[in-house]
Structure formats: C-alpha cells, structure tokens
C-alpha cells in the first residue's frame, strides 16, 4: 500500500527517483515494472505497479467499444499508458508526452493512493489540496454512508 506525499525531482532526462521506502515493495510485487497513464479527471498522472495495471486493463477490456463514453475512457487510459522499468538506481523514466500532459518539469509530488501513485506538478498539487480543503469546509451535502462510517 502506498501512502503519503513526497517531493521528488525529475532529472534532465525526465526520470524520477522512487523513494527508498517503496523500492523493495515495487521490486517484490512488480519486479520494478510500472505503468504510467493520465488521470482523466485531474491534471496529474497515475503510476501503477504492473500487476495493478493489469487489473485495470482487464476491466477496460470488458467495456464496449460501441459505447462512445466507454470507448473514450479506453482510448484515453490505454492510449496514454506507458510502461516504465525501475532501473538499478531506483529511477523511472516518465514519457515526455505524459510529463507535458501533467505539466511536470522539475519538482514533482509523488502521492501514494493505496495501490498506485499520483504524480503532480508541485504547485498544482498544493492548489488542488487547498481547493479540496476549501470544498470540504464549505460542503453542504450529506456525507455518504461510507464516509459517515469513517471515524478519524
């Protein structure tokens, strides 16, 4: 399970160094093989260990290519999916088209989200966090039953 937000830097080749605390887990569970794709709702990237991505691919394969909405989701997620292999120094090369999509240049937030990571431009990440907190503080809708059961 991946959790927490960590500031990492992209080098001049577009590689990020995976924090040490995640490397062993990624080597054991995925032999360092990852898949990166776009988030279709937010300006960030999604980074999955290969076995987790294969589950997503199976679900995507069950969608209908005749349904325009389902086909669009398939096209966006699969069309942008890029395999990346963690090298001996714990680095992952993020494809240029993906870096451009999320506006990633130098400082990147690696955000653990259970079975995957989100990759955000640092400034965009902090703006999103502020928007999310503001939305929660001004929320008028009733919490879902699942959120009501979440006791913090």
Swiss-Prot record:
Example GO molecular function: transcription cis-regulatory region binding
Biological process annotations from GO: negative regulation of DNA-templated transcription initiation
Lineage: superkingdom: Bacteria
Keywords: Cytoplasm, DNA-binding, Repeat, Repressor, Transcription, Transcription regulation
Cellular localization per UniProt: Cytoplasm, Nucleoid
Ranges of residues in domain SpoVT-AbrB: 5-52, 81-124
GO CC, alphabetical: cytoplasm; nucleoid
NCBIfam families on file: division/cell wall cluster transcriptional repressor MraZ
Function: Negatively regulates its own expression and that of the subsequent genes in the proximal part of the division and cell wall (dcw) gene cluster. Acts by binding directly to DNA. May also regulate the expression of genes outside the dcw cluster.
Family: Belongs to the MraZ family.
Subunit structure: Forms oligomers.
Protein name: Transcriptional regulator MraZ
């Amino acid at each position: 399970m991946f959790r927490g937000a960590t500031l990492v830097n992209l080098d001049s080749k577009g590689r990020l160094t995976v924090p040490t605390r995640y490397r062993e887990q990624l080597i054991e569970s995925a032999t360092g093989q990852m898949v990166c794709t776009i988030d279709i709702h937010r300006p960030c990237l999604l980074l999955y260990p290969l076995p987790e991505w294969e589950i997503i691919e199976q679900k995507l394969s069950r969608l209908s290519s005749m349904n325009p909405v389902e086909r669009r989701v398939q096209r966006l997620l699969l069309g942008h999916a890029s395999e990346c292999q963690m090298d001996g120094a714990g680095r992952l090369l993020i494809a240029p088209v993906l870096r451009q999509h999320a506006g990633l240049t130098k400082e990147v937030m690696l955000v653990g989200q259970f079975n995957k990571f989100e990759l955000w431009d640092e400034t965009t990440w902090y703006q999103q966090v502020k928007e999310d907190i503001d939305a929660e503080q001004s929320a008028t809708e009733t919490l879902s039953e699942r959120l009501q059961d979440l006791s913090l």
